[in-house]
Amino acid sequence: MQLHNLEYKKGSRNHKEKRVGRGHGSGLGKTSGRGQDGQKARKSGMVRLAFEGGQTPLYRRVPKVGFNNDRFANKYNVVTLISLVKYETKELTVEFMYANKIAKNEDLPIKVIGNAVLPSGTVVSAHKFSKGALESISNSKAKAQILE
């Protein structure tokens, strides 16, 4: 490909600007494609979104509902036991998980979930464990160390 062989993508240069109010012959003269008189024929004539002609709009007729706990929820880096099995170290610390990108956000505490068989003697350190994870760790003769 060379500079003198470059071409525009097909259909990319066909859109012409709509010139309105330039006489009958243009096809968009007189009313400029706005139809006859009425609010929508005026320059600022569109009504706002969800306007229902003075009737109380649906979003005000329907009551507010529910509660979202997002602001108050405790957020965690969730780490599965299956993702920890492939590392052949005896100590799986929080620093190790951050360093190996097992847990992404260093600002959040780590919660270990899931069920997998860890090598016996492994010590897993985290801020929180699910019941299933604690059960799996104790069944595989490993230790769970809960951090503050």
Curated annotation (Swiss-Prot):
Annotated disulfide bonds: none
Biological process according to GO: translation
NCBIfam families (UniProt xref): rplO_bact
Feature: compositional bias, Basic and acidic residues: 1-10
Cross-referenced SUPFAM superfamilies: Ribosomal proteins L15p and L18e (SSF52080)
Self-association and partners: Part of the 50S ribosomal subunit.
Any single Gene Ontology cellular-component annotation: cytosolic large ribosomal subunit
InterPro entries according to UniProt: Ribosomal_uL15, Ribosomal_uL15/eL18, Ribosomal_uL15/eL18_sf, Ribosomal_uL15_bac-type
UniProt feature, compositional bias: Gly residues: 23-36
One Gene Ontology MF term: rRNA binding
Biased composition (Basic residues): 11-22
Pfam family, one: Ribosomal_L27A
Coiled coil start-end: none
Classification via HAMAP family: Ribosomal_uL15
Protein name: Large ribosomal subunit protein uL15
Signal peptide: none
Keywords: Ribonucleoprotein, Ribosomal protein, RNA-binding, rRNA-binding
Described function: Binds to the 23S rRNA.
Region (Disordered): 1-42
Family: Belongs to the universal ribosomal protein uL15 family.
